[in-house]
């Protein structure tokens, strides 16, 4: 945390270590280089993931738009992180003091970095901190948007697919950013305090779980009604498609929700433990774990998303160098199936989403 005497304002920066020159030598340099390479790899994985689910369209455009923006928000955080690194390792100094600062949040005036007035370096640090807070809270609230979009799809079952309804993602994305920008500013300027600042993490996680379970129950009942052979199923073609899409989307979202909630809750829990001093002996280890959960979590999220659908998985695995060659030279397959059946099932699985959309579009011509 830093404070400016000229304005008497205190800023809570999402940075634990500042001005530590020990990171400029030895093992820490290799660790820093490794982290930067991991960030580059994470960016490649995000781009590949977004390209894959936009190329192989398995779900409604509104859901694709919101998922793409949700994942691409990571680039905001990593740009801020790369700007902060020189301050963390002491290459750029924002004061004349040479000692390192180790703190996250505190109400002890002696542990706060006090500066006479804002400078260009300190302003850059504050802006970077704001971007990281914005990314963190957008991630917390963004996962809820995917559930709300499925609520719209569930309620508007009659004609959701044949009308674009771009106002839904626009409204959800705009309202989310208005909330997160405002809340990020309050957290940055330390107006919320520590516990109020971290409370959305757990409150929103509970809300996401309740929303998911409610939508899942409704759509599971509709899917069972559609697939059953008994009377009472009078869905139109578009409604049948929407029921199937909702059910497939929620099956995909189940693992994704679990992974995202873990990616949100674990750093928040570690942050609370660090602030209250519950883990002083392993502080540095948990700092790196917490930061990696924040900046590297798209690797787990994207992999979970891509492995949820066979068509996406096949495209995603092409990112592995030599994957095509390994696949073509494989000599045996565990529990092989007849070739004709395998081909037929693979084609159906690969084109299932595309086939639904084509049939739906043809029915409305």
UniProtKB/Swiss-Prot annotation:
One of its GO terms (biological process) is sensory perception of chemical stimulus. It is found in: Membrane. InterPro entries: 7TM_GPCR_serpentine_rcpt_Sre, Nematode_rcpt-like. Keywords: Membrane, Transmembrane, Transmembrane helix. The keyword Membrane applies. The chain crosses the membrane at residues 26-46, 65-85, 124-144, 168-188, 196-216, 256-276, 285-305. The keyword Transport does not apply. It is a multi-pass membrane protein. Belongs to the nematode receptor-like protein sre family. This is Serpentine receptor class epsilon-38.
């Amino acid at each position: 945390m830093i404070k400016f005497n000229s304005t008497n304002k205190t800023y809570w920066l999402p940075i634990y270590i500042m001005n530590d020159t020990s990171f400029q030598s030895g093992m820490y340099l290799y660790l820093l280089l490794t982290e930067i390479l991991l960030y580059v790899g994470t960016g490649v994985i995000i781009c590949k993931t977004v390209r894959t689910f936009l190329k192989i369209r398995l779900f409604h455009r509104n859901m694709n738009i919101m998922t793409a923006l949700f994942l691409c928000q990571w680039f905001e955080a990593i740009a801020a992180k790369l700007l902060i690194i020189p301050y963390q390792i002491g290459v750029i100094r924002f004061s004349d003091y040479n000692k390192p600062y180790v703190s996250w949040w505190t109400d002890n005036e002696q542990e706060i970095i006090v500066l006479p007035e804002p400078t260009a370096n300190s302003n850059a640090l504050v802006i970077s901190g704001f971007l990281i807070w914005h990314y963190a809270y957008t991630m917390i609230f963004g996962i809820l948007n995917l559930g709300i979009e499925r609520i719209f799809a569930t309620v508007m079952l009659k004609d959701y697919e044949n009308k674009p309804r771009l106002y839904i993602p626009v409204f959800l994305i705009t309202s989310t950013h208005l909330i997160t920008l405002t809340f990020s500013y309050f957290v940055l300027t330390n107006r919320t305090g520590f516990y109020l600042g971290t409370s959305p993490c757990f409150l929103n996680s509970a809300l996401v779980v309740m929303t998911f379970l409610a939508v899942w129950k409704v759509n599971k009942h509709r899917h069972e009604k559609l697939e059953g052979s008994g009377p009472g199923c009078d869905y139109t073609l578009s409604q049948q498609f929407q029921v199937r899409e909702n059910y497939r989307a929620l099956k995909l979202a189940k693992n994704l929700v679990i992974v995202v909630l873990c990616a949100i809750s674990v750093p928040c829990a570690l942050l609370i433990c660090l602030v209250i001093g519950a883990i002083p002996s392993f502080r540095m280890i948990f700092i790196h774990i917490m930061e990696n959960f924040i900046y590297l979590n798209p690797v787990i999220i994207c992999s979970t998303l891509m492995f949820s659908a066979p068509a996406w998985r096949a495209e995603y695995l092409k990112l592995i160098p030599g994957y095509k060659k390994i696949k073509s030279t494989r000599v045996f397959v565990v529990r092989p199936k007849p070739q004709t059946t395998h081909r037929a099932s693979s084609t159906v699985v690969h084109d299932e989403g595309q086939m639904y959309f084509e049939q739906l579009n043809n029915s409305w011509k």
